[in-house]
Amino acid sequence: MNKDAVLKMLNRILELEMAGVVYYTHYALMVYGHNRIPIVDWLHNQANEGLAHARLAGELVTWLGGHPSLAIGPLLETHTHDIGDILRESLAHEAEILKDYYELLDLVKGQDVRLEEYARDLIVAETVHKDAVNKMLRKPNQLESFVTEGQMIK
């Protein structure tokens, strides 16, 4: 196993998860309107889960003898604070971090069962998040998936 590459990827995951904590917390503060309470609760839950994911990534870094990053990944924001824009940004964030968990899995597959299972578990969790956001972006009775660019899959 290429330990340096694994540590680099785990630190990137840590940074992206921390960006998600900031992102979801910020947007929970910016939601207005009659649907505010359930949306804010969902955003708070996403922030809390992101923090748990970040902590676990940091633990793995230190277990492997590395130093956890203090950096925070890129923060996406349209500054419109429209629920649709917030959800599209969430979808982009989930897709980005999901890609990194797959890259981690490729780095450790067949070499470290603990890291392999960690990557698989987080792939499942992030896929569930991505699918939940996708459904939230659909219009009532819309069965087709929403795509990041705002186009429907035909």
Kindly give the residue locations of the regions a language model identified.
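Iron-associated oxidoreductase/ferritin-like identity signal
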Residues: 1-154
